[in-house]
Amino acid sequence: MKLRIYTLLIAFCAAWSLHSCDNDDDESIAVPTPLQEAFSTRYPNVKNVKWETKAGYYVADFYDGYEASAWFTTDGNWHMTETDIPYTALPDPVKSAFEASDYKTWKRDDVDKLERQGIETVYVIEVENQNQEVDLYYSADGVLIKSIADTDDHENEHLPTTQLPAVMKTFIDGKYAGARIVEVDVEDDKNDWDFGFTEVDIIHFDSGLNRNVSKEVLFDKGRE
């Protein structure tokens, strides 16, 4: 009788331990009150939120029609929201541009909507063909901003944009009047010749082509 009781007790403890481990995997980290309030203000209808930290940011993973993650700093400032959307939810100009591109026959793997502080919304279509994977970045009006080979390193694949210094913004406004900033990135590969440079992707009207085109402006410590 005692043996049976002990056996049941051990089985119960083992089951409880596994259940506790599962709960730990799903638990959200604690976040500062200003951060919680900032999230609730931006997404008032979202109830179930899981918080984690990535690359120095607090990241809220949630569902609001689609799976999404919102990136904040400790003080509650919003910097980016990445939303996993279906292809059908893309703006029509983006779908038209993709379907007229050289990648139209490639398999669509994933589609992301990137909303970031200080710059325009960007849509990323991930495509693959045999052993090749490419990320295509489009503006909402269907301009292809850039195409990047996917290295399968999905850790911090999309990050909040780097804050553009005022001197660079002034230069762009002066040389490319009416330009729309869609991407800001500081090159961080020490093996590249442009290490430490700031790369700014803009969309600017080309009068010769009579259409909007994507241009890359490269700065070295405030100079183009």
Give a label for each model feature.
Residues 2-5, 11-43:
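Bacterial Sec-dependent N-terminal signal peptides
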Residues 8-9, 129:
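N-terminal hydrophobic alpha-helix used for membrane targeting or insertion
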Residues 28-224:
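First exposed extracellular module after export/assembly in secreted or surface-exposed proteins
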